[in-house]
Amino acid sequence: MKHKALYLYLILFFLLCCSVTTTGQEKKQERFTLMGLGDSIMEGADFFTCYLYPLWEKLFTAGYQFDFIGPRESKCRIGTLNHCGFSGKNVEFLESKIDSLYRLYPADIVLLHAGHNHFVEEKPVPGMIASYRSIINKIQAINPNVRILIAQVIPSGKLPKYSYIPELNEKIAEMVAGLNSGQVFLVNQAQGFNWQDYTVHDKVHPNKAGAEKMATVLFEALKKVLASSETVFSPEIVRYKTLEDGDSLDRKSTRLNSSHKAI
């Protein structure tokens, strides 16, 4: 009887150890690819900042290994970033190109922000939503495992041209909710984005603070989609030049945390 009890205790101890070991083995995020899909807000220009730049910094600092991919390049302080941003083009244009684009650049994650380059007089929202749906379907037909983050786009002070954007954002949210997909995620870039504070003189494109805000929102959304990173860095921002307009050029001195703690 004593031997039987000891045998049972040993089995329970073994099962407990297995349970603890399995729980402790948290899955880490493997290297992944991202496609930024959109218009000039995605592409960037000489007079405003593309939010993919600060997003790159946030992902890198968090210890993720990743690549931005696409046929187009934009220069920034970290070098060049690849993307699928097309200045002056709308979501219908992206829909017409996405099949060939995604076959050439089958990213693990697609970041879609495209709601501008229409006029309110066109009553464009129904057609735009149809294009969003088609983009999703075409991408998923090529890669069923792709994760798509669709943004409710940033508001604009260029009115009445862009006065359709609030309606568009409402319909985007309804569309994503209706899809009920574990692979398509809504990102609310409109909430808290005050164009008076966050856009350049044209009242459309993000300034440095606006790009930083957009990158923060998208980074928080990505953290819910990604597994934990292997490492985390602690950047120290050093200001080495102040421009005439009060903006600054910063350099990040990045070091690895001694604890190697994943976030």
Question: What do these predicted regions represent?
Answer:
Residues 33-35, 41-130, 159-170:
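Conserved SGNH/GDSL esterase-like catalytic core that processes O-acyl groups on lipids
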